[in-house]
Amino acid sequence: MTDKHSVKNSDFFEAKERLGLLTVGDPGAHDKLHVTDTVLISLARKVDNKIKQHPKLKHKLVGMRNKVRGAKYRIVSIAKSTTSTSAPVAEKATPNITQMIQGVSFPSVKHPDVSIIIPAFNKAEFSAACLKSIATKLSSNGPTFEIVLVDNGSTDDTIKLKSIENLVYVQNKENLGFVGGCNSGFVKAKGKYVIFLNNDAEVTEAWLTTLYDTIEKDPSIGLVGSKIIYPNGVLQEAGGIIFKDANGLNYGKFDQAESYQYNYVRDVDYCSGASIIIRRDLMEKFGGFDTLYQPAYYEDTDLSFKVRREGLRVVYQPLSVIYHIEGGTAGTNTNTGFKKFQVINKEKFSKRWRETLESSHVAEQDHYLGRDRSGNKLALIIEEAVPTPDKDSGSVRMVAMIKSLQSLGYKVTFWPNNLTKLSPYTDNLQQMGVEVVYGNIDFMQFSRLYGHAYDLVIMSRPEICARYINICKTLYTNAKLVYDTVDLHYVRLARQAEIEVANAEQLNEQSKWYELLEKGLMQRVDATIVVSNKEVELLQSEGVAGTIAVISNIHSIKEGAYKVGFDNRRDIVFVGNYAHLPNRDAIRWFMSDIFPNVNKKLPDVNLIVVGANLPDDLAKELKQKNINLRGFVSDTELATILTSARVFIAPLRYGAGVKGKIGQAVEYGLPVVTTDIGSEGMHLKHEVSCLEANKAEDFAKSITRLYADKSLWNKLRKNAKESLADHFSISVATKSLEKLLKD
């Protein structure tokens, strides 16, 4: 960036330096706040003006603007503290450490899962608060742990902490710094894993469990770090980035801790030693933190690089949260004290890892790419909302597609059109390593900043593709653009018109409109995804050109359910999301025209109706004898229902695509009676792997026949199981997706 376009870094560093000198209760803080606030306001105006004047430089300036906003936030917090009626620090009584730790104790554990090592030099009140947070926040149901407190030659009341029950207290004669303190604590540690935690931190309820589970469940991970937040709630670090020049960035510093980009699991360059967990054998192999970086700084970065050199991953876990004062023990001035080693050790680190930095790290202006250490290609998926796989089969398919992309080496960003964070579904994706966008985020702005970085964009459903395709074609210049139909809407509407005669004219008009829309979109993208071979054949017969791939629903056989045979099952079950109109029509047709005949033949058999979004009027219609109306159920409850039922019905009279509900029934060893619409695209054959009937009378006869014929029942489910494995596995979908992306 030329001088003409630049904003002086000196302005920001002056503001930051002044801010670092502020302390709560400082009698002169008001004057300092005024000066600092003035500097920041001036800087903020400069940055905003440069963004307006030079939009191409926006991505380089946004980070500085966020820092300014964060600094302003800290000023407000400090201002509130300095205007309180509390006495100045000098007049306050010294904290009573004995009172602070009253009632604090830790369990006695012979072979702990985790050793938590806390180095401390003076600031006994910090250490006491840290230990109290561990004692009060952590659940006894989590991993077992021991606490190793390293007194690094303290001269205050830190020694009083030694009285805490079952605390392992290591006392050094002198201050060995963070490196020496941690290493002396590690000698005493007995845990399978080791956590290093700063004494000026306080933990949260999920802090330990999420750190432990992340590393314990994935052998490819060597080190995991926490999300670090300032006491006022502002983000301090969401993983760290190291640039080619060895400068580091605490990603997200001074931004909002709940912003979407800081809340998904991802590989990072390093995690701050303020809160990390590492495998014990690795720490032993490395001989602890490297004494090259004695007394402190860059030792945690060096450790992360060594972990990665061993072929293991360094991962950021946002659900593990600590509140950290930062500099509470070491201070913040890089010209004096231990803090000066931040500059000295950077040079040592740069010299040791120069080749790695040059070959594998990005320049500072490319921090968007540098925030994710995986180096994977970037895929953007745009869909109406976050998938809810326990409510509809389309969501199951979407989650499976995301997993397939990840297995093919893509890092996935998921953009829900409604930009709504939906728990627990958003959280589940984030824990899979998916960046889920939510909040007041503008797609045009996002695309201008980052569109060039993406290799793939998948737009799901015609309405979504129509809304986003122009921006994507303009700004995602390096990406393959893919339209995922989910199903052919125009086909479904045409079939609905055949059933709903009263609305036929309107439905046919809608069908024609969707046909023009869908086929038009197919001509504007690089490839189209459909869910069945029948849809490929239809489109090709209608003259649609271009790449068309089949990525159907994904299913996995539940072998345990197949151990429950004919004699141990009873009742009939229907599953569907009733926001989908074909499902409403299906259950109404079944109740009015089919079930009465079934009930005559099988009076003791119940119909179990399962599914979300059941309208009140339909629910009233279903409140009849022999009908068990369950509505929405959890995955566990649904598994129990499907494992205990004898016959699954799918009386669909219109629709398109493939039917996830049928595939799910087969997963659980449940033979199916359906229509030709229901079996379409499912690779099922009448009398071989299912029973088909399109007339009400025939449908009822098929149910009663299958319900009573054990031999037929066993044959259908055996053949359906083989067909499902051949056509709907995750490996089949992944191969199809891989071929699509290579073409």
Language-model features, listed with the residues they occupy:
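Non-catalytic membrane-proximal stalk/linker segments that position and tether the catalytic domains
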Residues: 5-112, 332-395, 401, 427-432
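Glycine-rich, basic loop-to-helix element that forms the pyrophosphate-binding segment
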Residues: 171-189, 199
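Acidic donor-binding loop of glycosyltransferase active sites
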Residues: 192, 454-455, 526, 643-657, ...
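Conserved donor NDP-sugar-binding/catalytic core segment of glycosyltransferases
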Residues: 201-243
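Short, flexible, basic/aromatic active-site loop/helix in glycosyltransferases
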Residues: 243-269, 284
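Conserved catalytic-core segment of nucleotide-activated headgroup transferases in glycan assembly
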Residues: 390, 394-399, 403-404, 414, ...
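Short hydrophobic beta-strand element within catalytic cores of glycosyltransferases
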Residues: 661-665, 671-675
